[in-house]
Curated annotation (Swiss-Prot):
Biological role: Specifically methylates the N7 position of guanine in position 527 of 16S rRNA.
Organism annotation: Oleidesulfovibrio alaskensis (strain ATCC BAA-1058 / DSM 17464 / G20) (Desulfovibrio alaskensis)
Name the record gives this protein: Ribosomal RNA small subunit methyltransferase G
Similarity comment: family membership: Belongs to the methyltransferase superfamily. RNA methyltransferase RsmG family.
Pfam families xrefs: GidB
Residue sites binding S-adenosyl-L-methionine per the record: G87, L92, V138, E139, R154
EC assignment: 2.1.1.170
Gene designation per UniProt: rsmG
Reactions catalysed, as given in the entry: guanosine(527) in 16S rRNA + S-adenosyl-L-methionine = N(7)-methylguanosine(527) in 16S rRNA + S-adenosyl-L-homocysteine
The entry's keywords: Cytoplasm, Methyltransferase, rRNA processing, S-adenosyl-L-methionine, Transferase
């Protein structure tokens, strides 16, 4: 039987984040250590994430949240208060993001019971202001809510279907933030994965690229040009 993985300790987590180029405040280091240890423990018995130990979790998963913090501060500095995160899964990128970026109300939505239970337990252990977990279909979640100011999507669904789903659900001037493995499309430039140009109701307002273990990853900021009906 394999030995249980050693738990993360705050000095180790802080040092690894510094190695990756991120100097975190003490409260974020504490919260991230709690999260990593819970993620490591739960992933030993269920398929929450691919990595099973905390170091590769930081290098390949948490790093997305830390880069996303930088991107949002630069690309969407005046974001409104209602932020949605669909298909939040194990709380990535949302929970680590909220440890360093506390803007507005951040609503993580997932239909899967065990994943929402995990996120709720993390927030019970380490509360994050303005951060909420919802177990629901996204269609039901959106049904009785005003349009959002921003939506974050990491592998929830292909972006063309996502923008169709969000028709009338993002306020005019609001943003959809897509975490992707390829450059963003534009109105006259289809994307590589789907061969689709950006629809006329959206503008690409910012893009960010970074490298994780030799592969490029991207954030797209897509701004809604239409007022909700």
């Amino acid at each position: 039987m394999a030995r249980p993985a050693k738990p993360a300790e705050e000095p180790q987590v802080e040092a690894l984040c510094c190695e990756l180029g991120f100097r975190l405040p003490p409260a974020a280091v504490t919260g991230l250590t709690v999260y990593l240890n819970m993620l490591q423990k739960w992933s030993a018995v269920m398929n929450l994430v691919g990595p099973r130990t905390w170091q590769p979790m930081v290098r390949t998963l948490i790093v997305d949240s830390l880069h996303l913090d930088r991107f949002l501060r630069d690309a969407v500095p005046q974001c409104g208060p209602q932020i949605w995160d669909f298909g939040a899964g194990a709380g990535l990128p949302g929970i680590p993001l909220r440890m360093v970026w506390q803007h507005g109300e951040y609503h993580m939505v997932d239909v899967r019971e065990k994943r929402t239970m995990f996120m709720q337990m993390v927030l019970a252990r380490h509360p994050l202001s303005g951060t909420f977990v919802h177990r629901a279909r996204v269609e039901d979640f959106m049904a009785d809510r005003a349009p959002a100011d921003m939506l974050v999507s990491r592998a929830f669904m292909p972006w063309p279907e996502l923008l169709s789903l969000l028709e009338g659900r993002i306020r005019q001037g609001g943003h959809v933030i897509v975490l992707a493995n390829e450059p963003a499309p534009d109105h006259d430039r289809p994307d590589a994965a789907h061969g689709r140009p950006l629809p006329s109701g959206w503008d690409l307002t910012a893009q960010y690229v970074y490298e994780v273990e030799g592969s490029a990853r991207y954030f797209w900021a897509l701004s809604s040009k239409k007022a909700p009906s």
